[in-house]
């Protein structure tokens, strides 16, 4: 079965073939469009269906041409886009391997319904495996880059023997970033898909993906730190240990995915589709811990010259002294070794998530009429994620006592220190769990119905989806501060009834012109972790949890021609009753607190334009532009509880967010990409992109009446607390060059891509701080907001790839 590909590989490496010189027309992608074909007269629906299902021109033109800054398309969070393989939700980490295995990727923006998924308001990305065998079933590729990793390789093979099909793929990346110290990637992903077709028309498939990765990450920092080091890519997450670079923030993942699908025809017009998927693995993220000691993070505000006020600190930062600007691992180890009882003062631990997700789906697809298709289905999903801390490195200490170190000096709660009351004063060694241990369990049931009608000119769709979601927490540690069921065992169950309704009506004026209107109304249950004030060690749920409501509408016009494709979309989305929780330090109360925000409302509206123009035989131009307004339209309510005893510090206080803009979402974008298809396999691309009207991510806490009234006592301080920072506009200029060589039916392609040719120092994103700086002035005390955290987009970088298809 595998003899043929082995022989091909031997031929490939045993010698080299002379490159052929096919006609230039073979490199011209528009020949198929201009070929004169006899018009079909049996079913005129075929002509209108092409314009009704045209691609997303704005996304195709802008995805790789806009500046590499934080971009939430249409102002929606990234997780609002649904990614599906059948009824299985797939993560971004599986996308490259699915493509290698031969899956076709279809993107449906905004509220546009997908082929097999009703979708929401944030778009849908569908992966589908086509029938048949690819013309060039084997791929081998290597690539080189100076960003995130140095070298990568991937290979894929597709084999077909009678009714059986087998696809194999792997993708590997390794090396450190040449531009940002401390950043590196070691990743390997393997994939396998086995499918079989039966004489009855039934189809069965089994997919298995295994991604394994370890990545050193970078952290945001303050503008002062970037200015002192004169390095926009300063990374405070690393330092030297025994002369070698060591990163404190390393992400490690092993998360395999298995999917089994079966499609059985029940009649000539009806098919039953059943799917079962499982995603189970471990995700780890390392961080430094410190106990009754100063923070080891070098860019903490207390270590910066603006706070210390001494010249020695400023000179050390200006000289880029790593003892000041980076983590001093050797000093942390020396401090631990001085401990009289061997207890750790500093340690490196992993925040671990052990994930197990199971999905069972069934769908019935029938066509009672050639123009009408009905979908009826059900999806049951059970998710269980267990979270805990695990000791990775004691940094020279012999152990760590598992107690709440922050309460040691507390006069009231200093005698309630145990993190795990059922195992008091437990000594933690390398590899042991400590601190917290709990699980979040979520059950989702969805029943869906969808009708799709296509006539000569009319395209209409209507769909409904009703669900039931149940969420609860289960604690495995009994914390002494919250004894019994307050922290240990199951919490109360929270129930939600999410729904989705969608309606689309489209009309084809001609086979080249199409207008559609889509309306969507839905609600979704909050994230599981957003339903608990402190899920690490507390079963207490937020008061009055509500699902988030979304209303959306969009109007799309498409026009296609021999030389021009045009797509114009006007959209409007309203998000209501959003919620979130987090832990923070409240400077006015001088306490660690649990923050809950409810009633978040956002209005997201604008227009998008995408165009593709064939300028001549060899030249093509792709254009994209958008103008929008993404703003908070309601003032959310903020509740603040003491993290120690759940005392209410703030209860449903108003946060003056109305009028603030959504962060990480440019409200003005434009891009242009010029492509030249040259003779003998040459092609080149030049693209320029712009992102403007960008804003920092606003802080909810510091806009509450309590903070503005106590800290904003002067017009200048009030403005500093409430005025949202607008970020500089971002520009980028990119170029790429490709050359393809043909060897019979095989082809070799080499490419060079250059990003950010101008080398602009572009801000990627900015996040306002919740913290306030306390400034004593005689008998009075003033407060001012801490500096915002920011990060920069990558500098000028390159990407080289060589791939061979045969």
Predicted regions and their residues:
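Acidic/polar loop-and-plug regions of large Gram-negative outer-membrane beta-barrel proteins
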Residues: 203-261, 284-349, 413-430, 583-584
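A beta-strand signature from Gram-negative outer-membrane beta-barrel systems
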Residues: 54, 96-141, 152
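Outer-membrane beta-barrel signature, preferentially recognizing the C-terminal barrel domain
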Residues: 236-257, 261, 440-443, 490-504, ...
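Signature of Gram-negative outer-membrane beta-barrel scaffolds
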Residues: 347, 373-510, 535
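Gram-negative outer-membrane beta-barrel transporters
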Residues: 454, 570-574, 593-702, 801-805
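Surface-exposed extracellular loop regions of Gram-negative outer-membrane beta-barrel proteins
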Residues: 221, 418-427, 470-483, 493, ...
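Transmembrane beta-barrel wall of Gram-negative outer-membrane proteins
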Residues: 139-175, 179-218, 250-267, 502-504
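C-terminal beta-signal and adjacent terminal beta-strands/loops
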Residues: 20-22, 621, 690-708, 739-806
